[in-house]
Swiss-Prot record:
Protein name: Succinate--CoA ligase [ADP-forming] subunit beta
Enzyme Commission designation: 6.2.1.5
Keyword Aminoacyl-tRNA synthetase on entry: no
Binding-site positions, ATP: 45, 52-54, 91, 94, 99
Broad class of enzyme this protein falls into: ligase
Length: 388
């Protein structure tokens, strides 16, 4: 999960990383009130989960409360790279002497952690890496040792930071590492990291990506979820413990195993070309779950999408037997109730024949058993086209 700047800075502040004083506003009136409280010049910054805000006009300096009102009016509602601005961060303006760059990230290729730092801050780090690679220090971090004061200073020196910034930057880097580890982050980035006119080192911006796989250790991370941006069906699936991603098609997909579901998406897309370009409406992997409750939850979520005109249930029985899945489907339809959307069901593998027999005996009008994956995909696309 990527955080907004204000959320990243909240984490920073909790671990002692110096950040400018500021608050978020969702209306120009709130921005004016915050500017009045802060006094002096302020910066009004669009809160979106993408880069390039400054170039897009999403970061503006205001000379007082009324100017903050005007700047917030201009920024709120903006579209920045497909992201609508719903809030702004209003914070005290900083006296910037120099700008640097610092980050900690998960280095997947080398199966370790990596620190990156540079004296060239305030611009896209990809640009620095491409045009001046020698200006970007890369320091591998031993996961068992982490970043102590000595390691933090090593990073700052490798980045060729000036003497005036070394102590402050080293202290900040050590605290930034604590944020990275304690929050189970995959990325913690400060760009720019600034040296102020009075010699302080401050995180002027902040970017944090949290590892969703560690959510069970961090119930407090739930507060960071951008509810306005989360699809309600995806949120419902998450609450039910289902791996669901909403897509833009008409054929609902249920499968067991991510690989099989991905293959199903491809097969349905191919089959749909014959029927006006019908496409998968979702990704839903029920894993080893064949219970009536799991199937009912899955069907309820998929059928909650008004774009879905048919459902393709594609199961390859392994540890989970096909007869258990078939019973789950029969019971799920009773639980969900009043289902008119056709379900094309393909069962193969462990106890497939028994599963097909169960579905046949249930004699459910909406269930359309098909033996092959290609045949089932074609029928699902055809039924979706007929219902459109």
């Amino acid at each position: 999960m990527d955080l907004f700047e204000y959320q990243a800075k909240k984490l920073f502040a909790e671990h002692g990383v110096p950040v400018p004083t500021g608050k978020t506003a969702t209306t120009p009136e709130e921005a004016r009130a915050i500017a009045t409280e802060l006094g002096g010049r302020v910066v009004v910054k669009a809160q979106v989960k993408t880069g390039g805000r400054g170039k897009a006009g999403g970061v503006k300096v205001a000379d007082g409360p009324d100017d903050a009102f005007a700047k917030a009016t201009a920024i709120l509602g903006m579209d920045i790279k497909g992201h609508t601005v719903h809030s702004v961060l209003v914070e005290e303006a900083s006296n910037i002497a120099e700008e640097y760059y610092a980050s900690f990230l998960l280095d997947r290729a080398n199966r370790t952690f990596l620190a990156m730092a540079s004296r060239e801050g305030g611009m896209e780090i990809e640009e620095v890496a491409a045009t001046k690679p020698e200006a970007l220090a890369r320091i591998a971090i031993d996961p068992l040792k982490g970043v102590d004061a000595a390691k933090a200073r090593e990073i700052a020196v490798a980045a060729k930071l000036p003497e005036a910034a070394l102590d402050g930057a080293s202290e900040l880097l050590a605290k930034l590492w604590t944020v990275f580890v304690k929050s189970d982050a995959t990325l913690v980035e400060v760009n720019p990291l600034i040296l102020t006119g009075d010699g302080r080192v401050v995180a002027l911006d902040g970017k944090v990506s949290l590892d969703d796989n560690a959510d069970f250790r961090h119930p407090e991370h739930e507060a960071f979820v951008d509810v306005a941006a989360v699809d309600p069906l995806e949120q419902k699936a998450k609450e039910k413990g289902l791996n669901y991603v909403k897509l833009e098609g008409e054929v609902g997909i249920i499968g067991n195993g991510a690989g099989l579901v991905m293959s199903t998406l491809d097969v349905v897309t191919y089959a749909g070309e014959e029927f006006g370009g019908k496409r998968p409406a979702n990704f839903l992997d029920i894993g080893g779950g064949a219970s009536a409750e799991v199937m009912a939850n899955g069907l309820s979520i998929i059928l909650g999408d008004p774009a879905v005109k048919s459902v393709f249930v594609n199961i390859f029985g392994g540890i989970t037997s096909c007869d258990a899945v078939a019973n789950g489907i029969v019971q799920a339809l009773k639980i969900v109730g009043d289902v008119s959307t056709p379900l094309v069901v393909r069962l193969d593998g462990n106890n497939a024949e028994e599963g097909r027999r169960i579905l046949a005996e249930a004699n459910l009008p909406v269930v359309k058993p098909v033996d092959t994956m290609d045949g089932a995909a074609k029928l699902a696309a055809e039924l979706a086209a007929a219902a459109a």
